[in-house]
From Swiss-Prot:
EC top class, as a word: transferase
Residue sites binding ATP per the record: H16, D175, G176, K177, K251, F252, D260, R266, K267, A283, K287
Gene name of this polypeptide: metK
Cellular localization per UniProt: Cytoplasm
UniProt: Mg(2+) binding residues: D18
Region (Flexible loop): 100-110
Binding site for L-methionine: E57, Q100, D260, K291
Main subcellular location: cytoplasm
Name of the protein in its database record: S-adenosylmethionine synthase
Length: 418
């Protein structure tokens, strides 16, 4: 009997209050690592009407102006009009930072393996910055090997921001959210049930002042300029049965930090797989790569994506866990949900041999300390629209560079990954 169900994921635009915070946190991280690649950073940001608070723990030789960094990022996002209750030039920016605890620092600087002379391997030098568990996931539902609901939600959110920034839809404002419900049959996406867009907009649209007319104008424009282009290379598209909801409260004029406060790390499902895969609970933004919440989640995605790209599974989830101050993972788990072409035990053996999951090894493999300096900016660009499946960015953990090894090891034809 065919099982038919809906699965829903959401995304938010860069102007969403929580995403403002994520981006400021990662802008600070970029600036610090660009000057001092060994900076220890845990930058947290809070925003509210007319207010930005930067807090957390930072130990670095870098000299940066946190207030200027915050204002520059806020302006880049699009908050430049004080009449909207939040503006780069008029908001207050408060800074309250401490240094990293020496009790934590000693375990990161010299891992247990080094302290107790258990290993002289250079990659055993750095200990995990905290205990915890991280997940990575991939599936063959989209060209970028991501679940279709979150992939579509991100595409629509990015397009929503693009038509605002280019002036194609000049009445849009920075805050916005998207949501897509995909129809599945026996685990495969077969249709689009509902698309939801909530987008901040001006009080009037030129000569149009009636709210019903405003909402109809926005809805019609979003379908043509945002939704339709977002499905360009996706085989499954909206049809006559697809429900399309826009600003279902009736209007969305008050938005951004004037409408809701924001906080770094509150959009962890948006940042990852839209709820399709499990999540270890740790946020990414504002954290330097010794924090395994971030770096190990990137590594797990790399493992899972290569396994799926190699044709060894339709879906793959990887879990890794750590103890604070210890370099080597406490555990590694691989789950292919019955779609694997080889056993999870064999895949695990391969992963342990060919993928580096110690913090120092992850940092080295993806160049996580030096990449902001080399590219001019880096982490702030993944702080909105997802950290995975980004076809618009060159992300080291998205490379399918282990496919040939996997294919040779298990004699499977590889699939083409975006």
């Amino acid at each position: 009997m065919t099982r038919r169900y809906l699965f829903t994921s959401e995304s938010v635009t860069e102007g969403h209050p929580d995403k403002i915070c994520d981006q400021i946190s990662d802008t600070i991280l970029d600036a610090l690592l660009s000057q001092d690649p060994y900076s220890r950073v845990a930058a947290e940001v809070v925003v509210n009407t007319g207010l930005v608070l930067i807090t957390g723990e930072i130990t670095s030789k870098a000299q940066v102006n946190y207030v200027d960094l915050a204002r520059q990022k806020i302006a880049e996002i699009g908050y430049t009009d004080s009449n909207n209750g939040f503006s780069a030039n008029s908001c207050a920016v408060l800074v309250a930072l401490d240094e990293q605890s020496p009790d934590i620092s000693q375990g990161v600087t010299k891992a247990q393996e080094r302290r107790e002379q258990l290993s002289d391997d250079e990659l055993d030098h750095i200990g995990a910055g905290d205990q915890g568990l991280m997940f990575g996931f991939a599936c063959n539902e989209t060209p970028e090997l991501m679940p279709m609901p979150i992939s579509l939600a991100h595409r629509i959110a990015r397009r929503l921001a693009a038509v605002r920034k280019t002036g194609e839809l000049p009445y849009l404002r920075p805050d916005g959210k998207t949501q897509v419900s995909v129809i599945y049959e026996d685990g495969k996406p077969v249709g689009i049930d509902t698309i939801l867009i909530s987008t901040q907009h001006t009080e009037t649209l030129g000569q149009i002042t009636d709210n019903a007319a405003i909402q109809k104008t926005i809805k019609d424009a979003l379908w043509q300029a945002v939704v339709t282009p977002s499905f360009g290379d996706i085989e499954i598209k909206p049809d006559n049965n697809t429900k399309f909801l826009v600003n279902p409260t009736g209007k969305f004029v008050i938005g951004g930090p004037q409408g809701d406060s924001g906080l770094t790390g509150r959009k962890i499902i948006v940042d990852t797989y839209g709820g399709y895969s499990r999540h270890g609970g740790g946020a990414f933004s504002g954290k330097d790569p010794t924090k395994v919440d971030r770096s190990a989640a990137y590594a797990c995605r790399h493992v899972a994506k290569n396994i799926v790209a190699a044709g060894l599974a339709d879906k793959c989830e990887v879990q890794v866990s750590y103890a604070i101050g210890v370099a080597r993972p406490v555990s590694i788990m691989i789950e292919t949900f019955g779609t694997g072409k080889v056993s999870e035990e064999k895949l695990l053996e391969f992963v342990k041999e060919h993928f580096e999951l110690r913090p120092a090894g992850i940092i080295q493999a993806y160049n996580l300390r030096h990449i902001p300096q080399e590219r001019g900016r880096f982490y702030q660009d993944v702080a909105a629209y997802g950290h995975f499946g980004r076809t618009d960015l060159d992300l080291p953990w998205e490379k399918t560079d282990k496919v040939a090894l996997l294919k040779d090891a298990f004699s499977q034809p590889a699939i083409v990954a975006g």
